[in-house]
């Protein structure tokens, strides 16, 4: 059996509770970006070596860790891009809405000009 050497190295730091990793090409771009969704409600994307904020819905997410000894399966738990995301900007998220017991959803198209860049 032939041995294969594998090395791992981190690509980001200080992003807590990642729940989803996806790649997609943003409208108007020519390269794929890596998207990282976090359980607390913030989605980042990495493009050309920079980490940016794609969406921040932390204020709309149910407060995590308030029961069950700090363990929680709620929050932002799903992210999917429409097959034609590059053309129509549609994406879908699954999250636990604050003040409810069930999931919530945003029904808005993505607007590249409204991205909040992280500092």
What residue spans do the PLM features occupy?
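Acidic, Gly/Ser/Thr-rich repeat motifs that build Ca2+-stabilized beta-propeller blades
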Residues: 1-119
């Amino acid at each position: 059996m032939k041995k294969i050497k594998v090395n791992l190295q981190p690509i980001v730091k200080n992003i807590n509770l990642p729940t989803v990793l996806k790649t997609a090409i943003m409208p108007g771009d020519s390269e794929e970006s890596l998207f990282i969704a976090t359980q607390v409600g913030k989605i980042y994307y990495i493009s050309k070596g920079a980490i940016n904020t794609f969406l921040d819905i932390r204020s709309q997410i149910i407060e995590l860790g308030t029961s069950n000894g700090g363990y929680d399966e709620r929050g932002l738990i799903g992210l999917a891009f429409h097959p034609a995301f590059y053309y129509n900007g549609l994406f879908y998220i699954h999250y636990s809405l604050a003040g409810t017991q069930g999931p919530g959803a945003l029904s808005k198209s993505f607007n590249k000009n409204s991205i909040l860049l992280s500092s």
